[in-house]
Amino acid sequence: MSMFCYQCQETAGCKGCTSRGVCGKTSDVANLQDLLIYVVKGISIYDLKAEEAGIKNNEVNKFIMDALFSTITNANFSREDFIARIKDAIGLRDSIKDELVKNNVQIDDIKDDCALWKGISVEEFEAKAATVGILATENEDVRSLRELLTYGIKGMAAYAHHAYNLGYENEEIYTFMKKALVSTRNALSVDEMIGIVLECGKFGVDVMALLDKANTETYGNPEITKVNIGVRNNPAILISGHDLKDMEELLKQTEGTGVDVYTHSEMLAANYYPEFKKYDHFVGNYGNAWWKQNEEFKSFNGPILMTTNCLVPPKESYKDRVYTTGAVAFEGLKHIEDRKDGKAKDFSEIIEHAKRCASPMEIEKGEIVGGFAHNAVLSLADKIVDAVKTGAIRRFFVMAGCDGRAKSRNYYSDFAKALPKDTVILTAGCAKYKYNKLDLGDIGGIPRVLDAGQCNDSYSLAVIALKLKEVFELQDINELPISFNISWYEQKAVIVLLALLHLGVKNIHLGPTLPAFLSPNVAKVLVENFGIAGIGTVEDDIKLFLGEA
């Protein structure tokens, strides 16, 4: 076994990748990611001490966010990048340690190897990385809870990173991330670990609320919008991922250049924000969910900007047109450097590249509708409440989450098609691509698929549910006519799940498979306490959700 990773839904055999990631990452990159997380735990140990002593270093929180974000699925495949990050991590960790010593803060009690180990050469990194991975925790249940928490924190870091880019921060979130990381190094009881995992859900709600505030105060509340999925005849740039700050700067820099901009996958949600609608060269959305990019990036013809995950190892036919930025990296791809001294990123190279390219090849035409975030949906609250009271809407189905390659995910398309006509789907994330182009009709003018936006906009779905609970004067969110049938893929879906559990949501169905990182005993706890379940057949599940089983 040259690596071990089981953080995503597509992990080999639903057990773990041991020689190469299904995602495409090599074993050495997987191991270096483990080592980076290990050293970041050491940083966290010292920085919590520094916080207690009133010593503040603003660089630390950003570094931890970046490091965690770089290790999520389909973000960073670069060996060289992780080697550089590990060197920086050791340097930062030791600088915090030195500052503590200088300020006469007692650190003799710190004995953890992750706070003390020093490596200089790549060979030392690789040797150490082989010893600090997931399987270094021998007890299966302890390992399961530690990894569940770690993946939740990774998702949290991604959302905090986007908010940070827009100038929004919450120190309590940063402190929790560090405390949670340190907790994975301590010999805690199972009950204590479960408590921290559930606390992670609380901060998951907080970080999604922070990002929602950042996005809406910066770009306006998402509006119900018809989005063009066809093409024009101009050269263009395709922007993928989730980072709206990158979107803003790209639109500003392409204005007046003759280069159009299209969104891809979860960046579709940018079409819903009022601030972006003023750009005439912002055409619409091209393609589908992330996993189809091998074909769609080729047919797009122009350059592609990957702002965050999900990147698939690119094919030679279009590799020279893919640019990365932020936490994303892949050997051989051009990388656009981060902002410095308060200035915008420089997108001039990708813009000039676009001018030399043919216009996108049409792969579909027409429009799709989205923008049903909490502000837009709550403006329809009276209409929705009336529809529920009259029986026009029998039930809502939250089908947020991720899409992926597995054929078993066709379940979600089939499920959407088979739902009775008096039901409405609430969605967010790229899971929507399984049904957002189906003609499922409407109920009294309310579309039967209400897309709130990106995966973090699952927060909107929670806000909507809580508002409906208030309107209907219910004591418990689970009394609402809402069922949760969520598809997951990576670590941002984990923090969304933990956030829902914190809000008291029960009987969530999770698929297409339950996470490999849930040991039988941990899965049993989630089933018994929260009613977590997997998926069955479409017919059986619909009967179960509608109380007809």
Curated annotation (Swiss-Prot):
Top-level lineage group: Bacteria
CDD domains documented for this protein: HCP
GO terms, molecular function: 4 iron, 4 sulfur cluster binding; hydroxylamine reductase activity; metal ion binding; peroxidase activity
Chain sites annotated for binding [4Fe-4S] cluster: C5, C8, C17, C23
Keyword vocabulary terms for this entry: 4Fe-4S, Cytoplasm, Iron, Iron-sulfur, Metal-binding, Oxidoreductase
Annotated SUPFAM superfamilies: Prismane protein-like (SSF56821)
Enzyme Commission number: 1.7.99.1
Residue(s) carrying Cysteine persulfide: C402
Catalysis: reaction(s): A + NH4(+) + H2O = hydroxylamine + AH2 + H(+)
Compartment annotation: Cytoplasm
GO cellular component, one term: cytoplasm
Gene Ontology annotations of biological process type: response to hydrogen peroxide
Obligatory cofactor(s): [4Fe-4S] cluster; hybrid [4Fe-2O-2S] cluster
Leader peptide range in chain numbering: none
Free-text remark on how the cofactor is bound: Binds 1 [4Fe-4S] cluster. Binds 1 hybrid [4Fe-2O-2S] cluster.
Sites where the protein binds hybrid [4Fe-2O-2S] cluster: H242, E266, C310, C402, C430, C455, E490, K492
Protein family according to the UniProt entry: Belongs to the HCP family.
NCBIfam families linked to this entry: hybrid_clust, PRK05290.1
Function: Catalyzes the reduction of hydroxylamine to form NH(3) and H(2)O.
Identification of the protein by name: Hydroxylamine reductase
Organism: Clostridium novyi (strain NT)
Gene: hcp
